[in-house]
Amino acid sequence: MIMTEVPEGLNYTKTHEWYRKDGNTATIGITDYAQSQMTDIVYVDLPKVGDKKKAGDVLLTIESVKSAEDVYSPITGTVTAVNEEVAKHPESINKDPYGSWLVKMAIESEGEHLSASEYRKLIQ
């Protein structure tokens, strides 16, 4: 079994997104487990700054050599920043899924989320 990294201090979703709260801002990415299942990531279709999303809405799409996967918004809010570096170098998600954030959003409300220990149980 491959061990995947699940850092403490982040919130996780059942659809394999992570987010870190900093005041009223959420920084969002995909988990180590998600990137390992997708294999080599080749393209990220980021949303636009100003896009409004509800928790559970499709936030963006990531394409790998294996498949195209939707990434779902873990919160309800407005996109305030996108990581253009990830768009230019999508493989960075494979190398560092927790350092390669995808978007930042202003939080209106949070959706359902899991702690690190709950997420570890989900992916075992």
Curated annotation (Swiss-Prot):
Residues 25-106 form the Lipoyl-binding domain. Binds 1 lipoyl cofactor covalently. InterPro entries: Biotin_lipoyl, GCV_H, GCV_H/Fam206, GCV_H_sub, Single_hybrid_motif. One of its GO terms (biological process) is glycine decarboxylation via glycine cleavage system. Keywords: Lipoyl. GO terms for cellular component: cytosol; glycine cleavage complex. PROSITE patterns: BIOTINYL_LIPOYL. It holds the Pfam family GCV_H. It comes from the Archaea. The keyword Ribosomal protein does not apply. Gene3D superfamilies: 2.40.50.100. Its cofactor is (R)-lipoate. The modification N6-lipoyllysine is found at K66. The glycine cleavage system catalyzes the degradation of glycine. The H protein shuttles the methylamine group of glycine from the P protein to the T protein. Belongs to the GcvH family. NCBIfam families: gcvH (TIGR00527), PRK01202.1 (NF002270). The glycine cleavage system is composed of four proteins: P, T, L and H. This is Probable glycine cleavage system H protein. It comes from Thermoplasma acidophilum (strain ATCC 25905 / DSM 1728 / JCM 9062 / NBRC 15155 / AMRC-C165).
